[in-house]
Amino acid sequence: MEKIRVYQLAKEIGLESKELVTTLQELDISVKNHMSTLSEEEADTVRELYTESSAKDEDNKDETSQQQDEKQEDKKEQGTTTDKPLVAPPITVGELAEQIGVESTSIITKLISKGVMANINQNLEEDSLEYLAQEFDFVVTQEEPEEDEKSEEDRIIEQIRSEEPKGEPLERAPVVTVMGHVDHGKTSILDSIRKTKSIEKEAGGITQHIGASRVLYNDKTVVFLDTPGHEAFTEMRARGAHVTDIAILVVAADDGVMPQTVEAINHAKSAGVPIIVAINKTDKPDANPDRVKQELTEYNLVTEEWGGDTICVSVSAVQNEGIDELLEMVQLVAEMNELTSYPQNTGKGTVIEAKLDKGRGPVATVLVEDGTLKVGDSVLCGSTFGNIRAMVDDRGKRLKQANPVTPVEILGLENIPEAGDEFQVVPDEKMAREIAKKKQEKEREEKLKRSQSVSLDNLFDQIKEGEQKELNIIVKGDVRGSVEALRESLLKLNDNEHEIKVNVIHAGVGTVSESDIMLAVASNAIIIGFNVRPDPNARKAAEREQIDMRVYRVIYEAIEDVKAAMAGLLDPEYKEVVQGQIEVRQLFKVSRIGTIAGCYVTDGYIRNNSYIRVIRDGRVIHEGNIKNLKRFQDDVKEVQQGYECGILLEKFNDLKEGDIFEAYTYEEISPDV
């Protein structure tokens, strides 16, 4: 009996594959994805029943939508009221105590029990304030004036970026990057696609190599980035650009998975980009596609015919074989990902590449990702700006406007932007100039600030600031066995109890290269080398980007360094340490100051930052802080056993002669990994 694939049936009845897969599962027809097969009988069932079932779906959608609207109305009508005190950050411990009517020592004690050391004048962090709100029954409010803290340019940019979509969303073309090992045929495949499918074949003209090109297949456009390889891809991602929708991984059938193949896999996975495998050079006598598929399984790329979900296409760039199927799979993945854009919005997108042309000045190739870009528009492009004087597409044709996912060269910028910079249309050139100038000043300030790159030395501080508990690592070694041993040892450090996660995002054989540095920048990773040295370019790039790169000769030393850094990621524990005992021998009441206790240190010592317990008849009657510690008329930091001193407690005067002060502090215990 003849069988048909899900995506073929979807095309036949005018549905998207994703929608049909859902429908089939609702009909109890066993399918996994768009490549699953259906019997002729099952296909006929779908053809007959789909119209009826889709009509039911529409009715259900209307009912659900109506119910949701009603629920939202109910919520709006209900509203919420509260009698609890309202507290708005920023606020100090002392201010909070006064506002909610409790002793500051009570707040400090609660914070210490949570592992936060604080004093009366210290500003409370957001998580500490939320914790105290639960303990003391008040409400933390976020005040509106925070808006005023944002700069004018930030508000304008945010407003433009969060523009409400205009009109209906339209399906857009996918953006594809071709990756793989050197000499496996990345450029040959790109050339083969361009020769047979380029848009200029349909309309005439000469292809202009502007950094990206469009091809036409099945009356739909696909955009290919012209610079093959993962280096350019990762360099753009390091600058925050996420242009690529699909990665084509080229593997030579006669050579198999090689070091740069593994790099490309890890780069694509790190970016969360779907991978289509193109097994090239299948026309060669020693081609062995099955060996390639077997090797790919080691990197969790299992082809569909072997029960996985990785699309794999056999091609020969030289003989133009498999190109159609490759493009069909690209369009299928794009359809499953439901790529859309809003042409009526103002233009925004990403710089693909830029250069200084002697005759034309700064020239940038941009990819319009959303909205429409027009000649005469004022644009902000990274930290530069300009008024678009002219636009040229990949066929050399001058355009008056560029629609979504159209690569164009633009002229009229003040300076050369960098690949990966975002661009967006702004209301006028004056505004663009002002925003660009302020962004340039901000960039200069940021360069003077501390590096944002993660390192084993500052890992704990950065994790505390970012409230994350992950460590990304790139491993390079001299031989495969050492690399795998180091990788496995690092992964064993994952501590689920404390939610610490070590991610080895790439492990490869060979020297540390510039490509590794760019991946580290993009993924905020550290690099560990075992018995290998970085090449000169990598060393310079690591210094420039301030990437923590460490080289070891003993695996144990690498593991110990990472363990030490991870120990800093764990929430610290504290133990109480008693410093000394002090006896109150005389009291002096001073107006406007309080009761000063004349004391004698009977054991240990007392410091001016010690916490104090007041003990009377064996019972603790007060816990608090020292306001003043004196020897005669002088303020002192510490008084040792056998000496007298004067002590003024903070907000506590109910003392009696014979009371005992117990001085104590808290010490942090570094947890074991």
Swiss-Prot record:
The keyword Lipoprotein does not apply. Residues 171-340 form the tr-type G domain. GTP binds at residues 180-187, 226-230, 280-283. InterPro entries: EF-G-like_DII (IPR053905), EFTu-like_2 (IPR004161), IF2_II (IPR044145), IF2_N (IPR006847), P-loop_NTPase (IPR027417), Small_GTP-bd (IPR005225), T_Tr_GTP-bd_dom (IPR000795), TF_IF2_bacterial-like (IPR000178). Residues 180-187 are annotated as: G1. PROSITE patterns: G_TR_2. Keywords: Cytoplasm, GTP-binding, Initiation factor, Nucleotide-binding, Protein biosynthesis. Pfam families: EF-G_D2, GTP_EFTU, GTP_EFTU_D2, IF-2, IF2_N. Residues 205-209 are annotated as: G2. Residues 280-283 are annotated as: G4. CDD domains: IF2_eIF5B, IF2_mtIF2_II, mtIF2_IVc. Residues 32-90 are annotated as: Disordered. Residues 226-229 are annotated as: G3. One of its GO terms (cellular component) is cytosol. Residues 44-78 have a biased composition (Basic and acidic residues). Residues 316-318 are annotated as: G5. It is found in: Cytoplasm. GO terms for molecular function: GTP binding; GTPase activity; translation initiation factor activity. Transmembrane segments: none annotated. PANTHER family: TR-TYPE G DOMAIN-CONTAINING PROTEIN (PTHR43381:SF5), TRANSLATION INITIATION FACTOR IF-2-RELATED (PTHR43381). One of the essential components for the initiation of protein synthesis. Protects formylmethionyl-tRNA from spontaneous hydrolysis and promotes its binding to the 30S ribosomal subunits. Also involved in the hydrolysis of GTP during the formation of the 70S ribosomal complex. Belongs to the TRAFAC class translation factor GTPase superfamily. Classic translation factor GTPase family. IF-2 subfamily. This is Translation initiation factor IF-2. It comes from Natranaerobius thermophilus (strain ATCC BAA-1301 / DSM 18059 / JW/NM-WN-LF).
